[in-house]
Structure formats: C-alpha cells, structure tokens
Amino acid sequence: MSDEISGLVKHGVWVEADLPPDRKAVGTKWVFKRKVNQFGDVTQHKGRLVGKGYTQLWGIDVYASFMPTPGVEVLRTVLAYTAHQDWELCHWDVRQAFIQADMDEDIYVRLCDGCGVWSGKIVKLLKSLYGCRQSGRNFYLLMVSILKEIGFEQCGADQCLLRLVCDGRVVTLIAPHVDDLMVTGELDSVNWVREQIRQRLEIEDLGDLCFYMGCEVTRDRHARTITIRQTAYVKEVCRRYGTE
C-alpha cells in the first residue's frame, strides 16, 4: 500500500485542494486482487487505490466514459495473420497505465484510510485515477495518440487494431486491451516501436505472448500454428462454484 501511494505521489496524480462548496468529493477505497498466469496460477498479489466512480455525477464530474476494447474477432484475426506471416508475437504491459493520462475534468476525491499522511485529505486529480469513470477512456485516447504520433493508423474494421505501414506493407500490428498491448510484426519494426513507446510511456516487455484477453496462447512456430484456450477462465469458474 505504501508503494502504491509513493507511486501515485511520484507521478503527480493529485494536488491537495479545498473542496468547492457546490461539489461533493468522490470517495476512494483499496482494492486487492490476485494476478494469474495462463494456467490460472496466482503470480502476484496487488493492492490498488481506486476512486468510487459510481458516486460521480454525470454532467458534473464525468462527461464521457466509453473505452473501446478489441473483440475476440480481432484476437483471432491477428493471431492467424501472425502465424501466416511468421511474425514476432509480443506482450507489453503499460505500468500504472491510467495515471499516465491527464484528467481533463475537475475531480475532487477524499483519500481513505491506508494512504499514510494523505489519509482523510481532499485532493484534486491531475491524472486519471483507477476507478474514476473516465480514466479508462483517457488512457485509451492517450495510447492511440502516441501510436498515431509514431506512424500508426487505426483500422477501419476495429478502432482497437492499429497498423504501421512502411513502403506500402503492413509491418506491425498493435491491439491495446486496457493496459495490455498485443504486438506483432517484423522483428526490426517491433524493436523500433518498443523504443519509441518507451520514450513516451513506462512499459514492461513480458516476452512472447502467452496470455491475453483471458485466453492462453500457445504457438508452434515450426508448424506455423497458434492455439488459444481458456484454461484459466475455466479454473476460475470451477473455483467460484466449488466444482474444482
């Protein structure tokens, strides 16, 4: 929890402020979750401070909240094309993604217990805090603007699929799913794109794609096949209903 608060302060997510008389502060809470791999095994326990977005008032502190995500058709199409082209297939994670996007609206939040010296204080958000209704949309717009800045264009069939064209050829495809990026393309192009994004965002290269959008991804590069399964999802459903 202390690491989470330190990271938020480091990134300048908020500034202490007085609550205007005509406004209500959005509450915050701690959310604890387990991160699992493609087999459903727990790999990390995380604690995150989030805003109680359900208390935000439409037209006062939120005006737009829709954030598109790629459909399963995008996943299947990209993987099939990757196998056919024998391209690299990578998984990148944007660290503390939402707080890298600016908050355009005036949002005031009250920090809950567990925030150290900040507990109980009213702050104004400068960055997009997890849990606020527009935060996902803000980060999506930031991600797309960065990709367009380095030469990508959105595909007409799905705005969550972006392509980089060089000399009339598609050399890289990226499908962002919230803070996860599925990246495929020619090796030199993928390496160049990685460095360009790292100059603008904090990203972690997770290596070859093996788990994405809740699906386990298995590749046989020699046979040029890619298989997707939902092992982790099935395990979670069985655990939830006590049928393990």
Feature map (PLM): residue ranges:
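Long, low-complexity, charge-biased intrinsically disordered regions
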Residues: 1-244
